[in-house]
Design a protein with these regions (language model features):
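Glycine-centered loop/turn positions within well-structured domains
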Residues: 35, 73, 84
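Gly/Gly-Pro-rich "capping" loops immediately C-terminal to redox-active cysteine motifs
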Residues: 38, 42-78
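Soluble non-cytosolic domains of exported or imported proteins
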Residues: 19, 31, 69, 89-94
Length: 110
């Protein structure tokens, strides 16, 4: 019981968040709702080829766009819209902000 009383003030004074904003953004970017943003937009948001496929005699590519230059408001609006390929995630504005900040922080690292 004495040990609990000694530890309790430390627990109460510690940061109330389980993870930092940056960690939250990274977690969401790499696994928001089962399908990672990075699978189509790349580890840094740089965009990437998702798949190459044949249509008749032509080889076409389905490409996830570079999202590093998107503004926060553009990202919020884009995530509200229907996209033919991209799943809907129904992210909150706080979640989109965490993802946006995660991408912004990594811009110079490629």
């Amino acid at each position: 019981m004495k040990q609990l009383l000694l530890i309790l003030p430390l627990l109460l004074s510690s940061n109330e968040d389980f993870m930092s904003h940056d960690e939250y953004g990274e977690l969401l970017y790499h696994n928001p709702r089962g399908i990672s943003c990075a699978k189509c937009h790349g580890d840094l948001g740089e965009g990437m080829t998702i798949v190459n496929y044949k249509e008749g005699n032509r080889t076409l590519s389905l490409v996830g766009p570079d999202i590093r230059q998107k503004s926060f408001s553009t990202m919020v609006e884009s995530l509200k819209k229907y996209h033919k390929v991209m799943p809907r995630y129904y992210l909150t504005k706080k979640e989109v902000k965490a993802i946006y900040d995660y991408i912004e922080k990594r811009k110079g690292k490629n």
